[in-house]
């Protein structure tokens, strides 16, 4: 059912530009199939744009041209959304669950996304052609638990761009041991979307070297 889906916010045009029609198609697909396929819960439909699509898209300016890995891509949040917003960046979506991989492949084909590869694997088991320039993740684990999964995927000098909640700084403070072990430098919380989104997005950005 899509009758309870949130109307498209005005900020969508600002964040997606001429890629907005592709974002609309993906959002419509997620609204019509996401609950049935176990990708999103029914309570997410009234906030699908603001809480999920735009919440992911606001991160796009932090990405650099290169190869970005998205760990635990699930429904495609943020990986597919970022791939729509940033066609100049190559993405590797890492997802272990077969039904989600099927969904991701379907969306990549339908949306015509030429900048996306999908790897069916747990992050710690992923076999990649080369180290990544950046790694994203959303709603996966606490920062200290994410570091062993994400930091080893990066090249020297690569960057973590991890979407987090209001406790982002506390997560950094609680990860001192892992930060040292995985040679993480300059971990900081960046707040995105003020004055643009109804709810801001918080990102932990850090360099691994």
From Swiss-Prot:
Major place of residence: cytoplasm
Where along this sequence does the record place binding of S-adenosyl-L-methionine? Answer: 72, 77, 123-124, 138
* One annotated GO molecular function: rRNA (guanine-N7-)-methyltransferase activity
Alphabetical GO CC annotations of the entry are: cytosol
The record's NCBIfam families line, in alphabetical order, gives: rsmG_gidB
Q: Which gene encodes it?
A: rsmG
Q: What is this protein called?
A: Ribosomal RNA small subunit methyltransferase G
Keyword 4Fe-4S in record:
no
- What does UniProt list as this organism's lineage? Bacteria, Bacillati, Actinomycetota, Actinomycetes, Micrococcales
Protein keywords: Cytoplasm, Methyltransferase, rRNA processing, S-adenosyl-L-methionine, Transferase
Entry function: Specifically methylates the N7 position of guanine in position 518 of 16S rRNA.
Origin organism is Leifsonia xyli subsp. xyli (strain CTCB07)
């Amino acid at each position: 059912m899509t009758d309870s889906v949130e109307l498209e916010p005005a900020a969508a045009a600002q964040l997606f530009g001429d890629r907005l029609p592709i974002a609309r198609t993906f959002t419509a697909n997620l609204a019509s199939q996401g609950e049935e396929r176990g990708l999103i819960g029914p309570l997410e439909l009234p906030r699908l744009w603001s809480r999920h699509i735009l919440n992911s898209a606001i991160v796009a300016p932090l990405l650099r041209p290169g190869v970005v890995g998205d760990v635990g891509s699930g429904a495609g949040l943020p990986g597919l959304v970022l791939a729509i917003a940033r066609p100049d960046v190559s993405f590797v979506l890492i997802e272990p669950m077969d039904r989600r991989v099927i969904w991701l492949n379907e969306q990549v084909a339908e949306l015509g996304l030429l900048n996306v590869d999908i790897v069916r694997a747990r992050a710690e088991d992923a076999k990649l052609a080369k180290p990544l320039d950046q790694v994203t993740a959303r709603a996966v684990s606490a920062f200290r638990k994410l570091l062993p999964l994400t930091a080893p995927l990066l090249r020297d000098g690569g960057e973590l761009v991890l979407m987090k909640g209001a406790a982002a700084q506390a997560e950094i403070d609680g990860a001192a041991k892992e930060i040292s072990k995985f040679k993480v430098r300059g971990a900081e919380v960046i707040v995105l979307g003020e004055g643009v989104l109804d709810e801001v997005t918080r990102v932990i950005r850090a360099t691994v070297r």
